[in-house]
Amino acid sequence: MARNKIALIGSGMIGGTLAHIAAREELGDVVLFDIAEGVAKGKALDIAEASPVFGKDSKLAGADDYAAIAGADVCIVTAGVPRKPGMSRDDLLGINLKVMKAVGEGIAKHAPDAFVICITNPLDAMVWALREFSGLPHNKVVGMAGVLDSARFRHFLADEFEVSVEDVTAFVMGGHGDTMVPLLRYSTIAGIPVPDMVKMGWSTDEKMDAIIDRTRKGGGEIVALLGTGSAFYAPAESAIDMAVSYLRDKKRILPCAAYLSGQFGQDDLYVGVPVVIGAGGVEKIVEIELNADEQTMFNNSVDSVKGLVSACKGLDPSLG
């Protein structure tokens, strides 16, 4: 049986980490693409030379020509400029929009049947633009943000309750930014709702509020600590989670920036919601019930995303 083909568009810190994980997990043969050809080829060769040590047979290659991604089953897009200290994700809009145009056209020409996962920021606007530029089906183009934001939320909750991260479930809705909506009411510790754990005296409402705030600012916290660049280990692991669910038809429920066509009262918009990912791509959107406060926060987050999409249309009239 032929191996899957994984195309990684962008060979920076996330792209290189993705390649390493994909090779170690033997998800398929890996192509690293980058306009800086030497970087893509160098990282591919470095990981390939490590493969005898970790004992896996995935083939790796690097390229600066989109023809190299031909026939890819999954494309993970990290191309673009990362954040620097003091920058918001939104500050990257103008630069990365041009990158999405080139990437979208490249995927449309060479890998039109791929499942496409976008990581480039500002995420919700970039995945929308990437879909527009590529013309691929909406269910085959999705943004990685919710899995990452939820992982951060889970980590902070596990730390606070002093339990294994394996026993913590949580998810975050809305745009990938400071208006994201971490949903405490839908978060559990081994099936016990987090608000009930608080009532039992395991923590306090004030500490939960602080964790929610830290989750919203989680990316910025790492940017400030690193000084140059942004997070790459957790984003890469999160995107691999999504790719595996697609390649193995696992039908996992994961929070992702998905296309809404009436769900949650929104239309023609990509924003973070829980979805089922299987062999058909985004197979279902899980339209959970939000209370009044949650709905207000979600609407506020959606408005922020709409503003970015409008800005994209202003920068590139072809998106109008």
Swiss-Prot record:
Domain of life from the UniProt record: Bacteria
Catalytic residues (UniProt): H176 (proton acceptor)
GO biological process: lactate metabolic process; tricarboxylic acid cycle
Reactions catalysed, as given in the entry: (S)-malate + NAD(+) = oxaloacetate + NADH + H(+)
SUPFAM superfamilies attached to this UniProt entry: LDH C-terminal domain-like (SSF56327), NAD(P)-binding Rossmann-fold domains (SSF51735)
Family matches, as InterPro entries: L-lactate/malate_DH, Lactate/malate_DH_C, Lactate/malate_DH_N, Lactate_DH/Glyco_Ohase_4_C, Malate_DH_type3, NAD(P)-bd_dom_sf
Annotated NAD(+) binding sites: G10, S11, G12, M13, I14, G15, D34, N96, I119, T120, N121
E.C. number: 1.1.1.37
Catalytic class of the enzyme: oxidoreductase
Binding sites annotated in the UniProt record for substrate: R83, R89, N121, R152
GO MF terms, alphabetically ordered: L-lactate dehydrogenase activity; L-malate dehydrogenase (NAD+) activity
Keyword entries, A-Z: NAD, Oxidoreductase, Tricarboxylic acid cycle
Family: Belongs to the LDH/MDH superfamily. MDH type 3 family.
Function in brief: Catalyzes the reversible oxidation of malate to oxaloacetate.
Protein's recorded name: Malate dehydrogenase
